[in-house]
Amino acid sequence: MPFYVERLALEAGATQQSIVLHVTLLTGVYALMQLVFAPLWGRWSDRIGRRPLILIGLGGYVIAQVLFGLSTSLWLLYVARIVGGILSSATLPVSGAYVVDMTTKEERSRGMAWLGTAASLGVVVGPALGGLLSRQDWHLNWNAAHFKIDSFSLPFFAAALLGLLTLFAAWRWLPESLPNTLAQDAHLAKDRSEKTKSDWRTLLKTLFPLLALTLAGQFALTMFEGTFALFAQAKFDFGPVEVGYVFVVCGLVMTVFQAGAVGFLAGKISEMIQIGVGFALMGTGIALLATAQTKPLVFVFVALLSLGMAFIAPNLSALVSKRGGERQAGASLGIQNAANSLGQSVGPLLGGVLFIWQTNAPYLLSGAVLIALALGIAWKVVVKRRAAISTL
């Protein structure tokens, strides 16, 4: 996306600084839509079921990718991101709620790890495919009104095609995980309408510490994601293919360790300890990225921060679903997705501003925040264990 935005912005006469802001704004506006709509989709899935909202989310993703690929101006890119953010924000929280429906509490972390593994596989395939398809020697150039197809469009059309195939597979083979949902909703509609506000407040109060950690993790991750292409281009002269390779490494590390280590450790080491280790690894990797002087070190440090995120994401989702309760799994994970989205909105915007000020600043700040959180979690775990020992 950064290189696509850069091309359209340069055609519109934008400066290099405004290009940075457009890249981060386009990242942030998508997250802002998810911030607003993900909790609503999650709550709605508790009422009418998971399947229809997963289908809506996948359909919205397809529409957004097609619009993005056809865009010839920055304003069309913003329209595509807003539409995609609104509709596809149903996918993640409702998929998480689906996992909650299909697993026991003991299996929850493992289930969330496998869900994260599926998402990480997308991170592996997406950048590699995008880098290949955006090559300049495809000689594509078609224009009609406000729409255009060229080499930069192909990755988005490929994503739309994959999304369409997934939508068909879900429509054809995905069963509903909430039995008798519509009947339950009709019977409880009056009670729910009266209790909705208090339910939201109770959930927010119960989940607040976990939501704060979720926000911090996504803030740091998207500050990295939103500025990395610009950082790597400025410091190491990376192009789309090289940036794609870096994100392939990121996705591979998350895929392997979420499927392997996190699933294996589920039930053996508490979720909070794994989260603390994840913050320490991620913070160290991001901070060291600012000091990298060679291209191989970039890959090493990105792998380290990806390893940290592999521990953070599934364990946070598992804790949120447990503390929120199974009957409100959609609402709980929807609120968590809103916290994710808030971090995704603020991270790229602040990252863009810091990058304009000083190239390494986004990574030094986010690394310091994550390491401080890791130390705070470690202190809390130690205090809790001492209290437990003293009561024996």
Could you say what each language-model-derived stretch is?
Residues 1-20, 226-242:
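Short amphipathic helix-loop junctions that connect adjacent transmembrane helices
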Residues 35-72:
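Conserved MFS/SLC helix-loop-helix module at the cytosolic interface between two early adjacent transmembrane helices
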Residues 36-49, 257-271, 355:
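Helix-to-loop junctions at the C-terminal end of transmembrane segments
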Residues 49, 70-75, 87, 237, ...:
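Helix-breaking motifs and short loop linkers at transmembrane-helix boundaries and internal kinks
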Residues 90-104, 311-324:
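Intracellular juxtamembrane helix-capping segments at the cytosolic ends
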Residues 160-183, 376-381:
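C-terminal membrane-cytosol helix-exit motif in multi-pass small-molecule transporters
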Residues 175-216:
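Juxtamembrane intracellular "pre-TM" segments in multi-pass secondary transporters
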Residues 257, 270-316:
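C-terminal transmembrane helical hairpin of 12-TM major facilitator-type secondary transporters
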